[in-house]
């Protein structure tokens, strides 16, 4: 049994209660974000915040990100989605393309997919040679260790949904003309390899969940519950990192 099997995907909250708690957490995140930007309390800016979303296809990453940034000024957060590397990006070290979009002090970035594609899709689909993706675990740990050592608050989220829930969401997307664009042939193909992907995910969690950059597993069968848990988790990570505000740079 792996870490994913230990999650209780039946958890949920009544709609009214979940909505109330989500609004509260969104307001808390807004206050924290303004504080980190030096716009509330002190003009000293706080450390960078980098929030990484990974998860199954149709696990609700996009919806969770929308709720996460809903109360934030668009000037204060950068959302970036990553797909396959371009021809130019492939001419560089595979981590190179992530460097330009990492947040600086006082900044916040949200990544929909990330460098973890190296040990997930590139591993399973054999886009990367075995020695390359196996070496990537060490490269990722060192990369993240460097970011954290420089002050980055790194929050890594895996949104987990059951096989049955994923199928239900695929069917719903197929039947909705405003959502059908989200369902691709690649999604359907990946679903047939779910067991292989699950093995890759478990290896990823084991190899890259560290004390300084742990993975946070989000139970995702209930979208309301998952969205709340995401914002709560981000708030807790920021609060734990900045404490009483000692980690700040003067204006």
Language-model segments: residues:
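Charged, amphipathic alpha-helical linker segments immediately N-terminal to NTP-binding catalytic cores
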Residues: 1-27
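Glycine-rich phosphate-binding P-loop
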Residues: 52-69
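A glycine- and Lys/Arg-enriched "phosphate-lid" helix/loop adjacent to the NTP-binding pocket
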Residues: 12, 122-139, 147-199, 247-249
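Phosphate-binding P-loop
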Residues: 36-47
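Conserved nucleotide-binding/hydrolysis micro-motifs of P-loop NTPases
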Residues: 85-88, 114-117, 160-167, 221-225
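Short beta-strand-centered segment that lines the nucleotide-binding/catalytic pocket of NTP-utilizing
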Residues: 75-86
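NTP-dependent small-molecule kinase module
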Residues: 193, 198-251
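P-loop NTPase motor core
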Residues: 85-146
């Amino acid at each position: 049994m792996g870490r994913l099997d230990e999650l209780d995907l039946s958890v949920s909250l009544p709609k009214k209660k979940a909505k109330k708690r989500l609004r509260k957490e969104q307001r808390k995140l807004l206050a924290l974000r303004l504080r980190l930007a030096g716009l509330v309390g002190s003009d000293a800016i706080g450390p960078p915040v980098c929030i990484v979303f990974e998860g199954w296809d149709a696990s609700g990453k996009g919806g969770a990100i929308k709720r996460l940034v809903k109360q934030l000024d668009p000037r204060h957060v950068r959302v970036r989605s990553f797909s396959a590397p371009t021809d130019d990006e492939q001419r560089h070290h595979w981590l190179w393309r992530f460097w330009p979009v990492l947040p600086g002090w006082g900044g916040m970035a949200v990544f929909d997919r990330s460098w973890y594609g190296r040990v997930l899709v590139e591993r399973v689909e054999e886009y990367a040679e075995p020695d390359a993706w196996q070496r990537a675990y060490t490269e990722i740990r060192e990369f993240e260790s460097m970011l954290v050592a420089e002050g980055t608050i790194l929050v890594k989220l895996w949104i987990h949904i059951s096989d049955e829930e994923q199928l239900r969401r695929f069917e719903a997307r197929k039947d909705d003309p405003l959502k059908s664009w989200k369902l691709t042939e690649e999604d359907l193909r990946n679903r047939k390899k779910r067991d292989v992907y699950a093995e890759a995910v478990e290896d990823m969690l084991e190899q890259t969940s560290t004390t300084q950059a742990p993975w946070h597993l989000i139970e995702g069968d209930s979208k309301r519950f998952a969205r709340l848990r995401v914002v709560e988790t981000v708030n807790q990570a920021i609060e734990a990192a900045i404490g009483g505000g000692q980690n700040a740079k003067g204006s």
